Amino acid sequence: MSIIVALDAKSQYDALKIVEQLDPTLCRVKVGKELFTHEGPSVVKKLQEENFEVFLDLKFHDIPNTTAQAVCAAADLGVWMVNVHASGGRKMMETCVERLKAGNYQTQLIAVTVLTSMGREDLKDIGLDIEPVEQVKRLAKLTKESGLDGVVCSAQEAKILRELIGQDFSLVTPGIRPEGSNADDQKRIVTPKQAMLDGSTHLVIGRPITNAENPTEMLKSILASIA
């Protein structure tokens, strides 16, 4: 399944109301920091009870041992995917991979490169005088070398990364907006069809689906556009 629906909800109740209108055979769902902080692991279990595979989007970033423990705790919940910040470095990422393998977990582990809301000036503010795409390339290569399953990247960078890294690597792309949607707070955006053509393997889509009058029909429309 290529579509991951971002559950931008504050409560378990709101999240479950959203997934009531979705088909778990057509999409996976993403639980982020706000929802998980409000509701904890119970919201993951409830979504799994509704047969949804969960991407736990908590972007762990800490010393290697602490990050690996957090990743394994997420895997203990049975989530399909979890992520870390690639800027945590090689040792941090390699430790996470080693612990997942040691525990025989099936959870996919990916890394965040450059947040999609960040442009060159934002990077400059934190001491990186570099174009976002160059930093993305650097961190994506490090992620692959560290043994992770993929990265989060913008669709504009997907084609470059596919050529740089090869086929056996997931490119999970937020900032996806169907034709006519608002950009909201994502700076580097593109349509679902173009993202898939450029090499993305999974598309993270939130408000265009969850705020639609009929979320299932919107989801089916997006799937048809990338078929």
Swiss-Prot record:
EC number: 4.1.1.23
Quaternary structure, from the entry: Homodimer.
PANTHER family: OROTIDINE 5'-PHOSPHATE DECARBOXYLASE
Alphabetized UniProt keyword annotations: Decarboxylase, Lyase, Pyrimidine biosynthesis
Entry's Gene Ontology BP terms: 'de novo' pyrimidine nucleobase biosynthetic process; 'de novo' UMP biosynthetic process
Gene Ontology CC: one annotated term: cytosol
InterPro entries: Aldolase_TIM, OMPdecase, OMPdecase_AS, OMPdecase_bac, OMPdeCOase_dom, RibuloseP-bd_barrel
HAMAP family (alphabetical): OMPdecase_type1_B (MF_01200_B)
Annotated substrate binding sites: 8, 30, 57-66, 116, 177, 186, 206-207
Enzyme class, UniProt record, top EC level: lyase
SUPFAM superfamilies: Ribulose-phoshate binding barrel
Pathway in which this enzyme or protein is active: Pyrimidine metabolism; UMP biosynthesis via de novo pathway; UMP from orotate: step 2/2
Family assignment from sequence similarity: Belongs to the OMP decarboxylase family. Type 1 subfamily.
Catalytic residues (positions): K59
UniProt organism field: Acinetobacter baumannii (strain AYE)
Protein name: Orotidine 5'-phosphate decarboxylase
Taxonomic placement: Bacteria, Pseudomonadati, Pseudomonadota, Gammaproteobacteria, Moraxellales
